[in-house]
C-alpha cells in the first residue's frame, strides 16, 4: 500500500509538470484514495473508525454463521432480540441520557424522526394501492423507518461524543412511534392483517407503543429532561455494564436475523424497496443539511441515521400482516450492508469522529 501511494503521488506530480491529464486506472484509484485520506484529520481517526466498524461487521458475520449452523437452536434471533429490547437497549438509552447534557432544542428531532418514517409509508400506501395485498403489505412495512436502536445507537456511541447519542435518541423517539406499532396498526387498517380486521385501532396502537420498553424509556427520559430532572449517577453507573453489552448483542441479533433465501422475480420487489429507501434518504439528507437548525456535527449524525438499516420489526410485521417475511428479511439484510458502507464512508470522508 505504501509503494502504491508513492507511485500515485509520482503519477500526479508527473501530470502536473507535463501539464497534461492522462488516465491510468489503477494509479488514479490510488491517487483518489490518497486524496480522500488526506482530507481526514490524522491516520489515527481512520484506523480507529475502521477497527470499530470491522468489529461490528465481524459480529454480524458471526451471528449469521451461528444462525445457519443451528448451534443455538432453531430460532436464536428471537431469544437475542428479547434480550436486546428488554435489557440492553433500554439501559443503553438511559446511560446515553445520563452521560450527556440535554438541551431543549433537541426536542425538534422527535417530530423530524416521526416525519422521516411516516412520509415514505404514506407514499408507499398511495403508490401500491393497485398491488396485490401481500405485495402492498411488503412495500408499506419495509420502505419506512430505521433500525436506530440496534444499529445506529451502538455505531454513534462508538464513534461520536455522548451528546450525539442524546440527539440520536430524540430522533429515534419519533421513529419509534411508527416502528414499534404505528406502521403495523395502520397497515392492518389499510390492507388488513391477514387475521381479520383490527378492532379498536386506537387502543391497539397505544397498547403496542407502550408495550415497547425502549419507547417507554424514551418517553420517561424526555419528560425528565424537559423538567430538568437529572438522572442519578448511581443509575448511570448501574446501567453501564448492561449498556456496554448493547453493541455486541444488537449486532449479533442482526446477523442472526439476516436471511438470503429469496431469488428470481422476487428480487425486483427488493430492488424497488432499496431504490425507494435510497431516494428518500438522499432527499431527507439534503433537507437536513440545508434547513436543520443545528451544528454540522448534529446534522451529520442525523444523516447517518437516515441511512440506517430498515427496522428489525419489518419482517415480523410483514409476517403478522400476511406478507412475504422471507423477502422482507432479505431486503432488511441488504440494508444492513448498505448502512455499514455508507455510514462508514460519511465518517471517513468528513473525519469528524470523536
Residue ranges and their predicted role:
Residues 9-11, 22-29, 33-354:
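Alpha-helical transmembrane segments of multi-pass small-molecule/ion transporters
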Residues 1-7:
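Extreme N-terminal basic, low-complexity initiation segments
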Residues 1, 13-24:
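Short, low-complexity intrinsically disordered segments enriched in A/P/G/S/L with frequent Arg
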Amino acid at each position: 500500500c505504501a509503494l502504491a501511494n508513492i507511485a500515485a503521488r509520482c503519477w500526479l506530480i508527473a501530470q502536473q509538470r507535463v501539464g497534461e491529464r492522462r488516465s491510468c486506472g489503477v494509479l488514479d484509484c490510488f491517487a483518489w484514495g490518497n486524496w480522500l485520506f488526506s482530507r481526514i484529520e490524522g491516520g489515527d481517526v481512520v484506523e480507529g473508525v475502521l477497527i470499530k466498524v470491522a468489529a461490528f461487521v465481524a459480529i454480524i458475520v458471526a451471528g449469521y454463521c451461528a444462525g445457519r449452523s443451528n448451534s443455538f437452536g432453531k430460532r436464536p434471533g428471537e431469544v437475542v432480540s428479547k434480550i436486546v429490547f428488554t435489557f440492553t437497549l433500554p439501559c443503553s438509552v438511559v446511560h446515553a441520557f445520563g452521560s450527556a447534557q440535554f438541551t431543549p432544542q433537541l426536542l425538534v428531532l422527535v417530530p423530524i424522526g416521526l416525519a422521516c418514517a411516516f412520509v415514505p409509508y404514506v407514499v408507499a400506501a398511495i403508490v401500491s394501492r393497485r398491488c396485490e395485498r401481500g405485495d402492498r403489505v411488503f412495500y408499506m412495512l419495509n420502505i419506512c423507518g430505521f433500525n436506530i436502536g440496534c444499529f445506529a445507537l451502538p455505531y454513534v456511541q462508538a464513534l461520536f461524543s455522548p451528546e450525539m447519542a442524546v440527539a440520536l435518541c430524540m430522533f429515534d423517539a419519533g421513529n419509534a412511534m411508527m416502528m414499534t406499532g404505528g406502521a403495523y396498526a395502520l397497515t392492518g387498517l389499510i390492507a388488513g392483517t391477514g387475521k381479520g380486521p383490527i378492532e379498536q385501532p386506537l387502543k391497539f396502537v397505544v397498547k403496542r407503543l407502550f408495550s415497547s420498553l425502549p419507547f417507554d424509556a424514551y418517553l420517561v427520559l424526555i419528560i425528565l429532561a424537559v423538567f430538568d430532572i437529572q438522572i442519578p449517577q448511581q443509575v448511570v453507573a448501574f446501567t453501564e455494564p448492561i449498556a456496554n453489552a448493547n453493541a455486541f448483542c444488537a449486532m449479533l441479533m442482526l446477523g442472526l436475523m439476516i436471511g438470503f433465501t429469496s431469488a428470481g422475480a422476487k428480487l425486483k420487489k427488493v430492488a424497488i424497496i432499496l431504490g425507494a429507501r435510497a431516494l428518500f434518504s438522499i432527499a431527507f439528507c439534503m433537507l437536513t443539511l440545508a434547513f436543520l437548525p443545528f451544528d454540522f456535527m448534529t446534522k451529520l449524525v442525523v444523516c447517518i441515521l437516515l441511512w440506517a438499516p430498515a427496522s428489525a420489526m419489518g419482517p415480523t410485521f410483514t409476517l403478522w400482516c400476511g406478507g412475504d417475511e422471507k423477502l422482507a428479511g432479505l431486503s432488511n439484510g441488504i440494508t444492513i450492508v448498505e448502512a455499514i458502507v455508507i455510514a462508514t464512508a460519511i465518517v471517513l470522508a468528513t473525519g469528524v469522529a470523536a
